[in-house]
């Protein structure tokens, strides 16, 4: 059995969810969900979350793109829905503002040694987030990303500080 099957980008979501629900009932899959990487589709995803028909959602959330904090993340917490974050680096755009800059000294408080870890820890420290899935084809980037698993996670006040710090770099 599969652990998780998701309807990608909400393509024909109602039809596919019917199949996935049956597969879940049959024990072929443990969890079912839906994904989108488009903020314009958050309302559709929210509707699915409210329907009680899915166990997981996957959407974009990062230090730049924080729209999900308004409705999706609180709703996931409220409903006990797992959250997978895609595009945590916004296709590398989060690095544009910080190229050539060192991470702030205070990032050492939560064991960050590079910007990738800073950005990933911002994401995975949100109480609603189950995991983030940064895409990379480079081993050195994967190793940097894995470093975000080490040490403590930022608390809500530190998360605010991280977002403010990043926003002020613009």
Question: Which positions does each model-derived feature cover?
Answer:
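Glycine/proline-rich, positively charged
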Residues: 1-67, 71, 78-84, 125
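Structured C-terminal cap/extension of enzyme domains
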Residues: 51-56, 71-170
